[in-house]
């Protein structure tokens, strides 16, 4: 994985969508969400400010999905279906970026990934974001 101060090259699976992104805090807040949608999507996301993603190619190849409050915006490649990023409901000035799209990064690079509560969303409660579990990966020897 590269340092947090560097820009990361990123792409969907088929390469139709390509972008550069600067992460807000490197990989320190890599996380999953427990909401009904993210539970099915299964991606590990890292953070970037809305202005810190620049599309190199294929922005027109993205399709948008929204549900429930229509606040969060989830983008996917129309060709291969890979989720690239989403605008967060908890902070609309921030994107969650799929780590699997980042060049040289895999979700399996993270031995532990916190799972934040998306069922009782921080926007719906005064308690703010909370961790409801930890997803662990241990490679076979």
Give, region by region, the residue ranges found by the protein language model.
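A short Gly-Trp-Pro
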Residues: 1-11, 16-141
């Amino acid at each position: 994985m590269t340092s947090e101060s560097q820009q990361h090259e990123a792409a969907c699976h088929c390469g139709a969508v390509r972008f550069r992104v600067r992460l807000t805090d490197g990989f320190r807040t890599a996380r999953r969400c427990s909401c009904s949608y993210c539970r099915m999507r299964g991606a590990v996301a890292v953070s970037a400010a809305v202005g810190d993603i620049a599309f190199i190619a294929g922005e027109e190849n993205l399709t948008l999905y929204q549900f429930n409050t229509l606040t969060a915006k989830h983008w996917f490649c129309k060709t291969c279906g890979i989720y690239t990023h989403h605008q967060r409901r908890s902070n609309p000035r921030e994107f969650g970026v799929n780590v699997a799209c980042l060049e040289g990064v895999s979700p399996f690079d993270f031995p532990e990934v916190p799972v934040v509560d998306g069922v009782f969303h921080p926007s719906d409660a005064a308690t703010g974001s909370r961790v409801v579990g930890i997803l662990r990966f241990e490679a076979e020897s």
